[in-house]
Amino acid sequence: MLTHKNNQGGRKKMQVSFVIRDAEEKRHRNGVNALQLDTINGRLYSAGRDAIIRVWNSMQNNSQEPYIQSMEHHNDWVNDIVLCCGGRNLISASCDTTVKVWNAHKGFCMSTLRTHRDYVQALAYAKDREQVASAGLDKAIFLWDINTLTALTASNNTVTTSSITGSKDSIYSLAMNPSGTVIVCGSTENTLRIWDPRTCNKIAKLKGHAENVKALVVSEDGQHVISGSSDGKIKQWSIGQQRCVQTISVHSEGVWALLMTDNFSHVISGSRDKKIIMTDLRNPTNSVLICEERAPVLSLCYNYDQTGVWATTWNSDIRCWKLNPSEKLSFEVACIKGGAAIKKYHVLNDKRFMLTKDSEMNVAIYDVLKVKKVEDLGKVDYEEEIKKRSQKVYVPNWFTVDLKTGMPTIVLGQDEVDCFAAWVSAEAGLPEHAESGTDPKVNYGSLLLQALLEYWKPPPPHHHLQGVGSDLDSNGCDGDIRGNEYFSVPKHTPIIFSEVGGRNVCRLLVKDAVGETESALLSETVPSWVTNVVIERTIPKFIKLPFYLLAHPSMLKQDRSKKERLIANEFIQCRKVCEHVLEKVLGADLPASTGNSNSSQNNSQSDANSEGSQVPAEERIELLCNDVICDPNMDLRTVRHFIWKQSSDLTFHYRTKSN
């Protein structure tokens, strides 16, 4: 027996991610992995690859809005769901390694179970015992008492679970009979393993499939199992005889979804070949093609009166097909339309904006820094739009992009990509906020983290508690600076704190950080590299770039041919190097009019130098790199990236300009 607490031990490397999305996402933005129907009220629950569980009125006609609500707390694919307790509660399993317990009617997450150490792929439900099992890529199977799960609270967060051991490979399918006397798992071992969940004793191991077992159904009496495999076969097994009774070959590709009639006489199968087929187990040659979907089929579920079957695929639409075994081909009864998934992205050179292309060929522009979509460009040439917006500027990568859910998830970390790497001038990076006459340097990662956690005010340490006469402001705050001085991000933005490698630790919306519970959770979760810039207001380190400075061969004085090695912030512009050459290298030796070799004949040398000092350095000095004249506005890192193009230290040559 394992005792599980809903907390995390041991601090690991953490990363911060957020999703750029609308406040309400009414449509699935990616494939749908699983369905559950509440036959009492006709509510259809769908588990999306966009990390959202949505609830639909399945009895509405196509002209009415079927959307009821969204259930959001996962941050990766939701792989499976089960309705339990007469439809009052729902259990979900996700690639974020968690199992969650929901109030199905109100749509909120009641508790999160973190026992699994890898993707949780499948759930199984024993209705008569109110017991659920979870399994996944960590090869583990856990049994949960649902009544205990639904009673969990913040203070009572300990739950005991039974663990079933023996699986040698990652588990992709799981099934139990209603009375909970048999549990079966299918895995990449290509076998079925069977246990008695009451004792956790092994009953059988059944071999016969050639590939991963992706779908399972157990008969009500626990005597038979139907399995579907990536090998394209459907097999019927006798648990008592521990053998395969028959093999059905009606699909040309893997079988990923199975649905049985109540009397276990017919199997409805959905396949990677996009076909949904009904087969009579008593006469397997009697198979009827119900429909051919537009993409590989992921899950199947009866409609409220079992006259049709709901199907989901790699696409975001959910369709209901009429079940009519007497007809050669069925027809579509209803369709719950999905949205487009973003399939491609390109981060522009300024490392602030990115272009995306979705599954419907629409192109859009996103502002990563301000966490919003800027513009829908429609069905335009994606590559041309990238070229049109290409600039000769180099800013280091400071974030990564993940499109797994179909919506852009931006990841900030301190691992391979440092989120504090991008220092830019406010004039170049935030022109809409830059003030005339000033050009402060800003750090993109620092500004964004401050905006994401703008509503978070950590509880003060006990030894810093304010006493009588303390200096509190009119809002009751102790002078803390919130957010940043430039912008805020949308309040509905989800923020996720996770371990590098995938395990989710904490998820909340930007606006929810103000809550007492959320604030305390953040205090336990937020890594020090984030609190340093958000709370302590530590300024991230500038990145230095070494370079050599030499006189150009065209310069008259050959004694200036020695190499000078300098180190400067990588974002300084070439004009600053020109100023250094003018003031520190050439100094008073440079005449006011550099093109006049007889300038010593001027009436007043001092007057000439005074006049010349008013001329900007870049108009008197020219910088070259690889014999290319550098634009004074170009910064050092851009020169290195576009002109120098070498791993060795950057080298400049300088020369005076002729009039």
Swiss-Prot record:
GO molecular function, one term: ubiquitin binding
Key word Repeat present: yes
Amino acid composition bias (Low complexity), ranges on this chain: 596-610
Pfam families with a match to the protein in the record: DUF3337, WD40
Stretches forming WD repeats: 27-66, 73-112, 115-154, 166-205, 208-247, 250-289, 292-331, 337-376
Disordered, as annotated region: 592-613
UniProt KW keywords: Repeat, Ubl conjugation pathway, WD repeat
One of the protein's GO biological processes: double-strand break repair via homologous recombination
Disulfide bonds: none
Keyword DNA damage: no
Complexes and interactors: Catalytic component of the Usp12-46 deubiquitylase complex consisting of Usp12-46, Wdr20 and Uaf1; regulatory subunit that, together wtih Wdr20, stabilizes Usp12-46. The Usp12-46 deubiquitylase complex associates with arr/arrow; the interaction leads to deubiquitination and stabilization of arr/arrow.
Full protein name: WD repeat-containing protein 48 homolog
Lineage of source species: Eukaryota, Metazoa, Ecdysozoa, Arthropoda, Hexapoda
